[in-house]
Amino acid sequence: MHTVELRFYEELNDYLPVARRKCCFTHAFDGTPAVKDVIEALGVPHTEIDLILVDGESVRFAHRLHGGERVAVYPMFERFAIRPLHGLRPQPLRRTLFVVDVHLGRLARYLRLLGFDTLYATDLDDAALIAISVRGRRVLLTRDVGLLKHKVLTRGYWLRSTNPNRQVEEVVHALSLEKDLQPFTRCMSCNGVVRPIARSEVAGRVPPRVFKRFRRFTCCLGCRRIYWRGTHFQRLERLSRRRRFTRARHRA
């Protein structure tokens, strides 16, 4: 039997029992397991980890532990390069894309409202979600911790909140996306890009009273849905402005 001293930082502490949060603790193990296996045995999915230091040196997930080491584990720095340290994903994302688990439809719509490319469908099983995430380099958003422990996944985030309003704030904070908000540039229904369209082109495609009242229209390039600044738009605009998109104050 061997032991190792571990310390988890920032939001990774959410996965740990209270007694092990924000402090060093000792963990016992047999053999020479990979550091990834030890970490996930403690409940922390590898997709939320971007840096592991063993005795002050950055290591890969496959690094073997022999006992007596001190291990520090840090969350993903999704938008920042951390070289020359060994980040545990191929490279940080410069444009963050999402795929959302099947029970998170409202979150998907809110992310699209804010301008983020977000794939969502109610018929996607776990295998499909994982494949889309890996192939498209999309961050998989889910409430299922077990899903994030799949070995081929490299990008994922476990949502702490069950409230869609809180969830969208949580995602923006966790991935440092405050400066990337582009409200009303994506279709909330299909995720297509929304562009301005000439008023003359919407004649007959919107109710006569709408055509008479409004001068500016936009159109989804995917599903061709027409948008205008009516009551629905104003309600969504209030929703967008109400999001508390200020930097989260996490402390290790």
Regions found by a protein language model. Give the residues of each.
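Short linker/helix segments within small regulatory modules
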Residues: 62, 204-216
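Residues immediately within or flanking Cys/His clusters that coordinate Zn2+
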Residues: 184, 217
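Short functional micro-motifs and their immediate structural scaffolds
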Residues: 192-198, 228
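Short cysteine-rich clusters marking metal-coordination/redox-active sites
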Residues: 187-190, 220-223
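Surface-exposed, charge/polar-rich loops and edge strands
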Residues: 183, 190, 243-245
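Helix-rich terminal scaffold detector
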Residues: 96, 212, 247-249
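Long, charged N-terminal interaction/targeting segments
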Residues: 61, 70-182
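Ubiquitin-like/PB1-type beta-grasp interaction modules and other compact soluble beta-rich domains
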Residues: 1-97
